[in-house]
């Protein structure tokens, strides 16, 4: 394996990456993809040339500081010359003189040509009409331009030329100008009639008229394309990803209450296969302390020392306790049956019989 970065620095070579990953992997036991555990203490991390490394570190720091000190005065010298070239101020004054030209250009030159182009022909007829609408300020400008536009198609020959291509266009376009011509005095229709006259003048492109009608009625266009309401099921069939056959309205309903009681598990089946031992409380005429200190005289097994009496509540009997403890320390509590006791019991039994 190649030497680590720290080893190269100690040997006098150039320092590699700040951390040698190969050595780290080798020390932690991950080399070769085999996750073999090794202690996290790696002796190769011990620094050997402490004084040299420290001296070099400080020398490098001093060199860096010295270079910084040398570099900092240089910018100060370079900053000194820039103050003289303060000439950029005159250009700022020139920019201030720039506003006057925009003022000259801002004259309403662009708005004049359209206004002059439309009412250039009717000014002769405007003389009688101008007298009435002069008092109202906002409405007259629209009313002055529109009424002349209505009589133009009938009187001016240019309107007749424009009316010729109208028949090939769709039928709804032709009756609209006729209805507006019949009612020139109604000012409410004027703003709607003026743009249609302009569309007729634009004229030679019949494709624009149906496009505008389509945009005006998006509902009609959508119905003409589909010819039926969009079906969600049909739209799902187009998708390549298989989806559930149930529509959103036909969602399956939960068959039982488990849908609402998610946290509660049904343990009926579990109780069948995994019965739990239930503790039963048995009440006997002998208390626990009495059963540990005395023998039960009512039972026939009490006279037999070899067969221990099973306690009714499941607690360990004295014999079991003695067997567990070893029997030596319990001789004083329960003395072993001696030969004398055996003879006395035998005599009693003979007398009873």
UniProtKB/Swiss-Prot annotation:
Top-level lineage group: Bacteria
Disulfide bonds: none
Pfam family name, one: CBP_CCPA
Start-end of Polar residues biased regions: 196-226, 278-304
Skewed-composition ranges (Low complexity): 117-132, 142-164
Pro residues bias: start-end ranges: 80-91, 165-175
InterPro entries associated with the record: CcpAX
Disordered as annotated region, ranges: 1-21, 75-94, 117-337
Name this protein carries in UniProt: Cellulose-complementing protein
Organism: Novacetimonas hansenii (Komagataeibacter hansenii)
Annotated gene: ccpAX
């Amino acid at each position: 394996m190649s030497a680590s970065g720290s080893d190269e620095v100690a040997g006098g070579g150039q320092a590699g990456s700040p951390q040698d990953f190969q050595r780290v992997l080798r020390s932690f036991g991950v080399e070769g993809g085999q996750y073999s555990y090794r202690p996290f203490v790696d002796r190769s991390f011990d620094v050997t040339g402490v004084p040299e490394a420290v001296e070099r570190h400080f020398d490098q720091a001093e060199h860096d500081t010295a270079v910084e000190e040398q570099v900092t005065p240089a910018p100060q010298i370079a900053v000194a010359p820039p103050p003289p070239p303060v000439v950029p101020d005159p250009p700022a004054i020139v920019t201030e003189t720039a506003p006057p030209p925009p003022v000259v250009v801002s004259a309403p030159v662009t708005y004049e040509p359209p206004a002059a182009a439309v009412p250039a022909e009717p000014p002769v007829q405007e003389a009688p009409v101008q007298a009435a609408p002069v008092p109202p300020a906002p409405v007259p400008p629209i009313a002055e331009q529109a009424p002349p536009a209505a009589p133009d198609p009938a009187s001016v020959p240019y309107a007749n030329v424009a009316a010729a291509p109208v028949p090939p266009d769709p039928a709804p376009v032709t009756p609209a100008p006729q209805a507006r011509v019949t009612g020139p005095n109604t000012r409410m229709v004027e703003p709607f009639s003026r743009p249609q006259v302009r569309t007729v003048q634009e004229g030679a492109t019949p494709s624009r008229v149906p496009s505008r009608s389509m945009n005006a009625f998006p509902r009609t266009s959508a119905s003409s394309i589909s010819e039926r309401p969009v079906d969600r099921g049909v739209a799902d069939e187009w998708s390549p990803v298989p989806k559930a056959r149930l529509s959103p309205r036909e969602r399956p309903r939960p068959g039982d209450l488990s849908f609402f009681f998610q946290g509660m598990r049904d343990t009926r089946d579990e109780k069948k296969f995994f019965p739990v031992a239930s503790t039963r409380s048995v009440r006997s005429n002998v208390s626990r302390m009495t059963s540990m200190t005395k023998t039960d005289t009512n039972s026939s097994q009490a006279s037999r020392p070899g067969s221990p009496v099973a306690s009714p509540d499941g607690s360990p009997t004295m014999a079991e306790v003695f067997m567990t403890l070893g029997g030596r320390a319990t001789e004083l509590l329960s003395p072993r049956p001696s030969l004398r006791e055996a003879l006395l019991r035998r005599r009693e039994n003979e007398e009873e019989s």
